[in-house]
């Protein structure tokens, strides 16, 4: 809020992916006012939805906010918007209007963001293309503000102002990999890993660095397929600042992440590196 006394932010986190969340909050000196503590091993979409909805309701009753701001397309973002709607509190959606056109790709994020955009009273679209998507769906132009991408804002701030906690001293050209999307669980992650193994075997000048998501549906497969592979280094997800600098040091980024897709382009423009390959069948129209 920049210290504006008209606004009093109340931060509520879902608690999903605890280690990843805590390190990101630390970088930006954010201390949540409420933590829903949703995460449990092997959680399903049904569990996340009902648990987050039940735990967010008393927060809304206690705080009685004038607005609820949700960002992105995660299941908890949708639940936050739905809980606010049930409480008759206006919703603001950050990253509104991103679309692939297929309700099952990415799953469940594509449907989550469509539903959030129907609930929201004010929609912060990251691009003019996202605004056009919203207009095409019949959403009023007066409800849409093109704001730019907050992930890119965060990356630029960290790259300039926050040194990495970890520096990766690796030989050759770095190929950085992340892959974790739910639609890749049924064989997709394994196929990506086998492709990476072949890539490393055929290109002796590279080192593949795979930042392995903690979800067991991902980590178990990746470690089974790639542990011990030549010129492949598996790492736990580093802190946010270290990852930003690792991206900048990479010659190629292979990812299925929409967020990394967006910020990789910023690195590309700033450094003429890295290139990126997006491991998904459909992309958001950004």
Per-region residue spans from a language model:
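Conserved small/polar residues in nucleotide/adenosyl-binding loops
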Residues: 266-273, 277, 285-286
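A nucleotide-sugar donor-handling region in carbohydrate enzymes
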Residues: 12-19, 119-187
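An aromatic- and histidine-rich active-site surface loop
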Residues: 69-87, 264
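Conserved nucleotide-sugar phosphate-binding/catalytic loop shared by glycosyltransferases and other
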Residues: 5-55
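A short, histidine- and acid-enriched strand-loop-helix "catalytic/donor-clamping" loop
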Residues: 92-107, 121
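A donor-sugar binding/catalytic signature common to diverse glycosyltransferases
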Residues: 70-71, 93-94, 123, 243-269
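Membrane-proximal helix-turn-helix segments that form the acceptor-binding/catalytic region
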Residues: 109-122
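Donor-nucleotide binding loops and adjacent catalytic segments primarily
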Residues: 22-24, 43, 161-249
